[in-house]
């Protein structure tokens, strides 16, 4: 039995035991729609897949784990580096650095999944057996008999068969040794017989008398006994070995019969299970078609498959619903913050000096403020505005003054999409390579404000956060001159659309009228440029814009000698926007969102300017 134990210890070092060791590596895991793909340390041990923030943080515990027993591993249809692991409603989206590494991960996970479910073939050899030579010799030993009562598994019976095999091999070797010794003794016996017959022929034939018999009796007996007496070869008990051999073979046949019984019972059991599964599948197939539609209505919207893109699994209607819900949420948050700001402003008490200062300076020209390098109060002309983008600025300004102020009629194919009072919004449908590039034009008339005031609050970044609700953050990258700067602006994420940013030159100009009867024009022009310090990032899609806010102030003379008040002025606004979103999104969704958001923007901004200037001196 020492041989058996030693062989068993060697089996424990089987290479398949390496599956019990922990395997790990770095993969990209989809976290959420805000942070996207993040590098995580993925660990695989047994049938448990865990992930950590990094390999150094393993000692603090895993951030999540799933059991692979019922997991479904699915390679992505389009992304060659991505694969998904789903267990019920839990889905892990993982990406490898290259397709070969992805396939290695999939093969390893599938192997661990199979090993955890059914065990390996070599595991049968690791089962110890309580059978010994003595128990085998008893035919049906106590352990073997009890195995029928306890219904030992097939693996345990196979382990017993291996034990019987080892015992039988040793018994065959013993019997073979016995027969070999018998054959050697037989050949020696024949040799002795030939030698004795030769010796008898050398002596004369005499009648043996008593003395001869007495004198030669002992030596003859020794020769006879030495030739005819057979000792057991090598001290082997042939009868005992035969009985043991018979018992071992009986044990093998008995165990084999039991294995066959187990297989038959399992076959019957599996047949019953198969029949049940066929019936379940028949019923499930009917429910599957109805459930499939319902499941599509409740997708895992946090997954990367439902982001914008030509391969997005979300249809246009659901895409629009998601965008509209996100915009409504943003509006609700903005309204709440506006209420809080207005409440805070009402709590600030105004001193008498403040009222007197407002009343005395109401109709005075506002002096230039040096607190902001982007202030535009003193801006009169752009003749001295020289910088590296001057040529592009002149080209953009000339283009807007030539084409943007033209009437929307004619062959321009402008479509009126929104009309609310004095505000009208027009659109021309343009698509290029499947990307919506619809130019938009809006006209509006606002009483009580001047074109200079509207352009001032639209251009000056000091007021940007007061009226702009779609901006997450912005930064003045470079100040080109007193009336021109470069701005990097990150827009708020509206899921499922990807987050976007813009990098543009913003310039404000006053265009003097060549006709005395026509008013002067104030213009703010924003157009996209490139900057070495702010290249496009993987976090956002870089959009391209060409936007202009063009304002003219119309003054109606006051009655008598009264001074011009805000009741006598009207600002005529023309707003044009050409936006390239930089990525694919459903055309119907973009147009519906533009139809909703542009009028809201104009109303919100002009209302802000009205409130901001109501107590200020008129800025012509």
Swiss-Prot record:
Keyword Ribonucleoprotein: no
Keywords recorded for this protein, A-Z: Coiled coil, Cytoplasm, Developmental protein, Endoplasmic reticulum, Golgi apparatus, Lipid transport, Lipid-binding, Myogenesis, Transport
Superkingdom of source: Eukaryota
UniProt subcellular location: Cytoplasm; Golgi apparatus; Endoplasmic reticulum
Coiled coil (UniProt feature): 265-298
Molecular-function GO terms, alphabetical: ceramide 1-phosphate binding; ceramide 1-phosphate transfer activity; ceramide binding; ceramide transfer activity
InterPro entries xref list: PH-like_dom_sf, PH_domain, STARD11_START, START-like_dom_sf, START_lipid-bd_dom, START_lipid_transfer
SUPFAM superfamilies from the UniProt entry: Bet v1-like, PH domain-like
Reactions the enzyme catalyzes: N-hexadecanoylsphing-4-enine(in) = N-hexadecanoylsphing-4-enine(out)
Motif FFAT per record, residues: 318-324
Function: Shelters ceramides and diacylglycerol lipids inside its START domain and mediates the intracellular trafficking of ceramides and diacylglycerol lipids in a non-vesicular manner. Isoform 1 plays a role in neural development and skeletal muscle development. Negatively regulates apoptosis during development.
Quaternary assembly: Interacts with VAPA and VAPB. Interaction with VAPB is less efficient than with VAPA. Interacts (via FFAT motif) with the MOSPD2 (via MSP domain).
Entry protein name: Ceramide transfer protein
Species whose genome carries this gene: Danio rerio (Zebrafish)
Lineage: Eukaryota, Metazoa, Chordata, Craniata, Vertebrata
